């Protein structure tokens, strides 16, 4: 398992296409997340193995022969702040648990309930970094919170969002409608969205 550290999650996403090109057909996983998920896992009291420097990370796994050579090519192409090769299976499993546990915690940690509705938004990987920057800006512009993460090698992002739904108040759905419309309009510029075949949360 190769862990790559970047200043931000969007910059981690920017590196995805270079990794895919450096090891074509060899990456069996290329997952992205940032320090918000790591902080949630730590706050729960779960151990977090050492991560490379940065606030955004890619977790990459390579399959096939000549794995050391493929890893060297990935590191050379990554333009990362810092890298860490994890050979110990137990430690690699603990790192994957951060992604798995954090994904669940991300939807339950906000001050108000979080909902699906903008799940599995996908763009071509070469546009993912730009889309993540736009997505975070759209959240802020609509007064919403969410913790994105996802399958960066596929250009696919998950995020549960604290839409301000209020029972019996149809007007409370207005923010949801406005946000979804704004996201769909912006995402069209990036030739999204369709979840890649076989992608799951």
List each model region and its residues.
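Noncatalytic alpha-helical scaffold of FAD-dependent oxidoreductases
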Residues: 1-198
């Amino acid at each position: 398992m190769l862990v790559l550290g970047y200043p931000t999650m969007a910059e981690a996403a920017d590196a995805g296409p270079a990794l895919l090109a450096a090891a074509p057909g060899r990456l069996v996983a290329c997952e992205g997340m940032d320090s918000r998920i790591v902080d949630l896992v730590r706050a729960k009291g779960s151990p977090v193995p050492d991560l490379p420097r940065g606030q955004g990370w890619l977790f990459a796994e390579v399959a096939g022969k000549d794995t050391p050579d493929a890893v060297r090519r990935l590191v050379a192409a990554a333009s990362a702040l810092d890298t860490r090769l994890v050979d110990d299976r137990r430690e690699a499993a603990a790192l994957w648990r951060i992604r798995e546990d954090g994904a669940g915690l991300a939807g339950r940690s906000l001050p108000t309930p979080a909902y699906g509705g903008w799940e599995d938004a996908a763009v071509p990987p070469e546009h993912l970094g730009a889309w993540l920057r736009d997505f975070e800006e759209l959240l802020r512009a609509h007064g919403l919170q969410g913790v994105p993460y996802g399958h960066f090698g596929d250009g696919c992002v998950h995020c549960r969002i604290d839409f301000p739904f209020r029972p019996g108040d149809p007007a409370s759905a207005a923010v949801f409608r406005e946000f979804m419309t704004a996201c769909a309009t912006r995402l069209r510029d990036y030739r999204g969205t369709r979840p890649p075949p076989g992608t799951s949360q």
